[in-house]
């Protein structure tokens, strides 16, 4: 026992050490926040709405992109190089919409399982992929609610769980989402396939 005489405080090193060890192990400092189902569920529902809005905007943009590509291919001579560049952008948006759809379904699932999430200490095995994918995607997609969702899962399951999700340790991320949100450009074959399909549909 150490007595800090200036303020009359008795410090018990063992108790403090145990408290800090628990906080370090989970990556949670209770003084600054903690898991709250009342915060997580509304954020999941808001994310679902945000994904739906983003999907609709992307879909409308893609329709315009398709018309622009068709016009470039119909010119005499066809402006194939410009059309090819536009097609890459179209493919990226197409991939993004597909990833959004999967992430939206994941948020809906987690919202329905909020009671289970709240009452367990470890992440349920059948939710590891959905939760890890949401955490991983929070740093990539422009859906602000995912930041708070990621924070709540860090409070609930610990910083190690969050870090493993961010690094995709053990391949926990949904493979389709990982592919669709990859920074790698689409293959030349895929771009050509899109161009041919657009040309056929706008003859």
In which residue ranges do the predicted regions lie?
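Extreme N-terminal basic, low-complexity initiation segments
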Residues: 2-6
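Extended, charge-rich alpha-helical scaffolding segments
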Residues: 8-173, 177-180, 185-193, 197, ...
């Amino acid at each position: 026992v150490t007595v800090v005489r200036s303020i009359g405080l008795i410090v018990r090193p063992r108790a403090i050490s145990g408290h800090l060890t628990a906080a370090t192990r989970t990556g949670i400092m209770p003084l600054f926040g903690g898991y709250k189902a009342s915060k997580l569920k509304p954020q999941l529902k808001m994310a679902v709405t945000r994904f739906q809005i983003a999907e609709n905007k992307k879909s409308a943009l893609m329709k315009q992109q398709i018309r622009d590509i068709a016009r470039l291919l119909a010119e005499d001579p066809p402006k194939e190089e410009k059309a090819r560049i536009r097609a890459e952008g179209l493919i990226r948006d197409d991939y993004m919409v597909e990833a959004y759809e999967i992430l939206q379904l994941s948020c809906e699932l987690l919202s329905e399982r909020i009671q289970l999430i709240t009452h367990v200490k470890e992440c349920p095995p059948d939710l590891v992929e959905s939760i890890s994918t949401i955490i991983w995607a929070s740093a990539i997609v422009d859906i602000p609610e995912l930041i708070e969702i990621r924070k709540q899962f860090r409070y609930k399951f610990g910083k190690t769980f969050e870090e493993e999700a961010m690094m995709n340790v053990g391949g926990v991320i949904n493979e389709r989402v990982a592919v669709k949100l990859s920074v790698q450009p689409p293959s030349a074959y895929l771009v050509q396939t899109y161009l041919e399909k657009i040309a056929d549909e706008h003859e």
